[in-house]
């Protein structure tokens, strides 16, 4: 089921249930899309304003990228469900089945792929939001800050959905490679999102 076609209320109700999906990965994707949209809204409120004529072309181009990014993040809600279900099924294989370990290993790696991609998309979103925060309408700068906070939360949430799976991998080389990618993104873009938030916040007290 593509939960992005349901209402917000329905999404939250299913999220709170014992259904295998959506879970943390799907929620991270949705929050990332919301954060991206908040940044994009700043762009929408900037375009067409004489005060920002010098940056209008840049903002329009950035908005187009964010439009695509929002869609891609929303697509990850269903992708996470599709890529998690094989792992959920693998847990049902009897422990004495000789194929269990190999099936679990493959399914676990597949389950990591979507949250890793969500993280990559969130990093891209944070870069875009930093531009909206710096060059977009001052009347909507708080929304850029909110967007950065949301996307950082999505970045962190997605990482946990990687780590819970890499912990169980037998192939530690693959696990550590994925962990390293996550740590690098968390360090660089978590700090960037924090800087956006602090800069926006400080601007209200000058």
Predicted feature locations:
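Transmembrane signal-anchor/signal-peptide helices with a preference for the extracytoplasmic
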Residues: 41-53
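Long, charge-rich low-complexity segments
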Residues: 79-91, 193-206
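A structural-propensity feature for long, helix-poor, extended segments
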Residues: 50-89
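Preference for long, well-ordered alpha-helical segments
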Residues: 125-128, 140-199, 206
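Conserved phosphate/anionic-ligand binding catalytic regions in large, soluble enzymes, centered on
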Residues: 17-40, 140-158
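Amphipathic alpha-helical interface segments
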Residues: 80-149, 153, 165
């Amino acid at each position: 089921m593509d939960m992005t076609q349901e209402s917000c209320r329905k999404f939250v109700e299913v999220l709170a249930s014992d259904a295998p999906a959506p879970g943390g990965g799907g929620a991270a994707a949705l929050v990332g899309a919301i954060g991206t949209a908040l940044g994009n809204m700043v762009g929408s409120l900037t375009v067409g304003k004489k005060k920002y004529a010098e940056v209008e072309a840049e903002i329009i181009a950035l908005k187009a990228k964010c439009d695509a990014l929002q869609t891609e993040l929303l697509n990850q809600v269903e992708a996470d469900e599709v890529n998690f279900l094989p792992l959920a099924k693998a847990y049902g294989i009897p422990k004495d089945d000789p194929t269990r370990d190999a099936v679990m290993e493959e399914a676990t790696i597949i389950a990591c792929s979507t949250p890793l991609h969500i993280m990559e998309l969130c990093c891209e979103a944070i870069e875009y939001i930093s531009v909206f925060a710096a060059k977009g309408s001052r009347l909507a700068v708080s929304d850029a800050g909110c967007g950065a906070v949301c996307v950082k939360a999505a970045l962190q949430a997605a990482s946990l959905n990687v780590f819970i799976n890499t912990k169980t991998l037998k192939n530690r080389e693959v696990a550590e490679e994925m962990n390293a990618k996550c740590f690098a993104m968390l360090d660089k873009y978590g700090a960037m999102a924090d800087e956006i938030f602090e800069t926006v916040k400080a601007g209200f007290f000058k």
